[in-house]
A protein has these predicted regions:
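Hydrophobic/aromatic-lined pockets within catalytic cores
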Residues: 70, 157-164, 242, 256
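A residue-level signal for conserved active-site and pocket-lining positions in enzyme catalytic cores
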Residues: 62-63, 155, 237
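Short, charged, low-complexity amphipathic alpha-helix
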Residues: 200-253
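Mg2+/Mn2+-dependent nuclease catalytic core
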Residues: 97-208
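A short, compositionally biased
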Residues: 14-18, 168-171, 259-264
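Extended, charge-rich alpha-helical segments
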Residues: 84-91, 242-277
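Short, charged/polar micro-motifs that form catalytic or ligand-binding hotspots
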Residues: 48-56, 141-149, 234, 238-241, ...
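Metal-dependent nuclease catalytic cores that hydrolyze phosphodiester bonds in DNA/RNA
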Residues: 1-112
Length: 277
């Protein structure tokens, strides 16, 4: 198969300083605000503004360091975050294809995918860089990871609209952080965390609800089927199988011995079973 290149939408612009998206002059909404409004309206409650600002500033700094490495091979030797990012890329075989790749639904929404990694001629994976406090794999941070899942799912949905001939293999969070805590210890995290994509229908419904000014309700996930195994029955059948095979082996050995003594090469039982020596 011939390699399929990424499509870049003519007229789609991202003004990074103001974090605004435009398509041929029409302003589009980013998905981050939609996710907050529709699904996690209280996620920032009680967090002082100066902490939010400091977190955003740190995140922007790390994003830029990683982007400069991926796009320009500019290496910041003092950045532990870059060292950890490069280690993750080596461990998981990530092949950088694009950073801050713009996607859109061509009507109301747009976003910039942090990372797009090439998997094959027609397949990519999409990664999102997170520098937030707290291990995202821990139960206490389940909501943070679910927010990432929704964000990546919307990226995937719009990526496929922009690139209808391509496929998306995996969605994952690259959680990279190295900050000094108040007690002087180092809060260092370097993890790749896979997330399961939401169905395309759910992504469309979420964005449609936002356009209509309606409140979106996330469909309940189907309960996971539990695997049940009757271990005692399996053990009994395996034991029976072993005993039967042992008896058959003894019968076969005796028959072959008797046939050899009688000079017979073929024997057919009264019920039609044919035995050949």
């Amino acid at each position: 198969m011939a390699r399929i290149e990424l499509n870049y939408v003519d007229g789609l612009v991202f003004q990074e300083d103001e974090h605004r998206y435009f398509l041929n002059g029409k302003e589009l909404s980013g998905v981050t605000s939609v996710i907050t409004k529709q699904l996690f309206p209280h996620s920032m409650d009680g967090i002082p503004k100066h902490i939010l600002n400091a977190s955003a500033e740190y995140g922007s700094k790390v994003h830029k360091i990683l982007e400069n490495w991926d796009k320009l091979w500019q290496k910041d030797d003092e950045s532990v975050e870059l060292q950890d990012y490069r280690s993750i890329c080596r461990e998981y075989g990530l092949v950088h294809e694009a950073s801050e790749y713009l996607v859109t639904d061509f009507q109301n929404f747009a976003s910039a995918c942090d990372k797009v990694y090439r998997v094959s001629d027609d397949t990519v994976s999409i990664g999102d860089i997170k520098t937030v406090y707290g291990d995202l794999t821990k139960k206490a941070n389940k909501e943070k990871l679910e927010r990432c899942r929704v964000q990546l799912s919307l990226y995937r949905y719009m990526f496929l609209l922009v690139n209808p001939k391509m496929k998306v293999k995996d969605l994952f969070v690259l959680h990279i952080r190295c900050k000094e805590r108040k007690n002087g210890t180092i809060d260092r995290i370097a993890k790749l965390i896979y997330v399961e994509p939401l169905p395309i229908s759910t992504c469309k419904a979420l964005l449609e609800a936002e356009v209509k000014g309606e409140q979106f309700v996330m469909p309940e996930a189907e309960p996971q089927k539990e695997l049940t195994v009757d271990e005692s029955l399996i053990r009994h059948l395996l034991q029976t199988k072993a005993e039967v095979e042992e008896q058959l082996s003894k019968i076969k050995a005796r028959l072959l011995s008797d046939m050899e003594a009688l000079g017979e090469t073929t024997y057919i039982t009264p019920t039609g079973i044919k035995i050949v020596r």
